[in-house]
Amino acid sequence: MNMKLRAEVLRSRVGWVCAALLAFTCLRTTASSTNEVGKQDRWFYYTNDVNDEVPLSIHVVRVELSHHDFEFCTSLGKGTTLGMAVVSDQVKALPAECGQPLAAINGDFYEKSEKYLGRPRDVEIHLGEVISTPAGHTSFWMDPDGVPHMTNVYSRFRVIWPDGKATPIGLNQQREDDMAVLYTAVTGSSTRTAGGTEYILEQSTNSPWLPLKIGQVYTAKVRDARASGDAPLSRDTMVLSIGPVLAGRVPALRPGATLQVATETVPDLSAARVAIGGGPALVQDGKPMQWPGFLHMRHPRTALGWNKDYFYMVEVDGRQSNLSVGMTFPELAAYLVKLGCTQAMNLDGGGSATLWALGAVRNSPSEGEERPSANALVLVRKKPAASAH
């Protein structure tokens, strides 16, 4: 039987609030939150560290990695398609199969063009489905054993033509004239492209098919070939879009032809059920990273980190002189080290910085209200296993 969750606002401790300022001095905690916000299990804690002198307001969720009652899930801006929404609305729209949401933070940086607004900059895996390809920045994922990982991830997605030659492809993104991009229904009702050649693909006999997963080779049959863009999308089809400049350098296919789509990444994320991009890395092997001067400005920040025992979701309020001025990257990295993180990475910050826990947004967004984000990382209590009858 599940225990009721009770979150306790912990007394601020030097070990939790010690962060390097530009002179790398320790924060001195002069105030701490005292409001009860819910209930706790021993494996889950939420705290708000407040320092009135700097000032700083830092929101932290800590979860025990050894506890097997939780997992992570990512969200999409529009629930099932790319887009933008505030974190609290993304949590509400999370599929029931993810489990009961306990905490969430905003996720990756994102595409801002109108047609593909909310497309994550780097890799996202949602319930095992790959939403976007990695772009080489720092990304986070969990392996099947519940072990967190962080490194730069690279795409080797490609289409393999009938003659055996291969062409690199993007996924659910802006297609330039010299590019090839694969689209799934995550993009929306159509590809939203202009010009080029587009192949509507359906499942070939005995081939794995949708939802699209990393580490597969899909054999697809061309259902239709179109000499214009904006091809329709459905849950059982994909569209391969070829830009007009590239079209003259790749084979022209007719309906009934087959091709292959390889969804490889480096490192291999085929076993990951959840992944989200961001960056840069903040802490590696227990040591804070170093950055050039332009990253030494204080802003609201969102980060995640872990050690062998605990996983942390962290948000630092900023741009509010009476509440919290924010942190530089060195200050944030030092704070995460003081928490005990051996690995940690940055996520989108600024006005996007949001931490939701136990039913409500706990931080003070810098723009006075939540700003829409492309995705979020959500901590959920697993759904109980169905009992046998």
Predicted regions span which residues?
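Bacterial N-terminal signal peptides that target proteins for export
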Residues: 2-17
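Gly/Ser/Thr/Pro-rich low-complexity, intrinsically disordered segments
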Residues: 27-389
